[in-house]
Amino acid sequence: MTTARRRPKRRGTDARTALRNVPILADIDDEQLERLATTVERRHVPANQWLFHAGEPADSIYIVDSGRFVAVAPEGHVFAEMASGDSIGDLGVIAGAARSAGVRALRDGVVWRIAAETFTDMLEATPLLQSAMLRAMARMLRQSRPAKTARRPRVIGVVSNGDTAAAPMVDAIATSLDSHGRTAVIAPPVETTSAVQEYDELVEAFSETLDRAERSNDWVLVVADRGAGDLWRHYVSAQSDRLVVLVDQRYPPDAVDSLATQRPVHLITCLAEPDPSWWDRLAPVSHHPANSDGFGALARRIAGRSLGLVMAGGGARGLAHFGVYQELTEAGVVIDRFGGTSSGAIASAAFALGMDAGDAIAAAREFIAGSDPLGDYTIPISALTRGGRVDRLVQGFFGNTLIEHLPRGFFSVSADMITGDQIIHRRGSVSGAVRASISIPGLIPPVHNGEQLLVDGGLLNNLPANVMCADTDGEVICVDLRRTFVPSKGFGLLPPIVTPPGLLRRLLTGTDNALPPLQETLLRAFDLAASTANLRELPRVAAIIEPDVSKIGVLNFKQIDAALEAGRMAARAALQAQPDLVR
């Protein structure tokens, strides 16, 4: 819907209407309501401003006319939300106690303030008002529901910073959202908004329109198109739960509204390779190309329906990830976000590049078709291999692509040997992020990154489901490769057909028993050292897929067909058990 500027309503009418809609005042008669309306004070509360803090004297009751407010406990968590028609602070005034919590404006709001003295004087002078309020409060207690602690974004600002018209993009986003719920659009003519001289004029003119649209729709898109004016751009930023910023120039503008950095931001990239300074400036939670796939992925994020796929490390067993992805996508499962560790990072990056399953599998076959990627052995000073083959393979596969330019969400995990910290790669070179995540200590040399010395993330988090689940925009499918260890009986540096006799075995290993090669021992140690958190206890886990890869050697990349089939079978079983994964 499109709206134009509105003149504010007359104050007296507004006060009576606002008071009449308050539950605790529902039963008072018109004369009492009129008397109370003459004493109230109208106040504009800017976005992010505190109405009051915990511990302050309860000196007023506030009636929300427009906007949205949150109650914040002294510990800092939000435990309730208030919108148009709600009263704030009434119990504290009646009890004569200090504020038990703070209240902050989520967006620009208008409240009616009733001074505590005025309210208590009226209660004492009007016994009928006391009875009416007690009845209303009793009803409220009977009908009370637990406060919402988590809430999906509903007001989405769409901002054009350059020459690209926002209207076609908004239409595409709204169309994509239609399959998830009802969407309204507030996009006043730029001639109207650019002519406004005072910010309060916008608050007066559009707050009621925004409140009404929010009450009757699942989402409201508020649009600041090119030429709409700085005041309107600020108003859109202030009202929005999230912002969608259109990127149609290589570098961000010199001036970015301060509120844009205080809201979750999604970028719609209208050119192929915007400069990473956009990410420096706005720290977006996601970015999407300006095409049908990108608009669909953005809509799923807004609706909380964005599916993530997180994959574990496991050497050659990680080839099962490609079979899982093939089975899921061929069944119609749409995945927007990918993440993983070690071999899971390789698969995640391939899928985030936008490859379909067939192309990804073909690329995986090409990846392992040549010489053994771990075959460039050297004197083991920092590692058993030089790492040159791995470097060439990773660089040849992913090139100079930046994570910021991938069409789908991606992260990988490595570990910093200096600090012992988990490093989550969401920015920079895809090749660098993958190479760090697969740097098995002792087998592949670590990666220097500034003051960091990065090794395989499996040392700390072999299946980073907790990282993916921290994103609240949708559910997550986990691919877990942890299985009973079946060691091979080879000697690593020797071909499997060469089995040393007992005497030579004793000379090489000091034992008559057949032991697994060093590479397998290192990889298995990762499985044991990594977190054993119960995946089912994590929020937003939709499914756990567990391919049976126990018979696949962790370094036997020639078993790609067996690994692919194990992945397909496990994904097929998950789909049969949970058909709702297809959305």
Curated annotation (Swiss-Prot):
It comes from the Bacteria. InterPro entries: Acyl_Trfase/lysoPLipase, cNMP-bd_dom, cNMP-bd_dom_sf, LysoPLipase_patatin_CS, NTE, PNPLA_dom, RmlC-like_jellyroll. One of its GO terms (molecular function) is lysophospholipase activity. A nucleoside 3',5'-cyclic phosphate binds at residues 24-140. It comes from Mycobacterium tuberculosis (strain ATCC 25618 / H37Rv). The keyword Lipid metabolism applies. A motif (GXSXG) lies at residues 340-344. Keywords: Hydrolase, Lipid degradation, Lipid metabolism. This is Uncharacterized NTE family protein Rv2565. The active site is at S342 (nucleophile), D456 (proton acceptor). Signal peptide: none annotated. A motif (GXGXXG) lies at residues 313-318. Residues 309-469 form the PNPLA domain. A motif (DGA/G) lies at residues 456-458. Belongs to the NTE family. The keyword Ligase does not apply. GO terms for cellular component: cytosol.
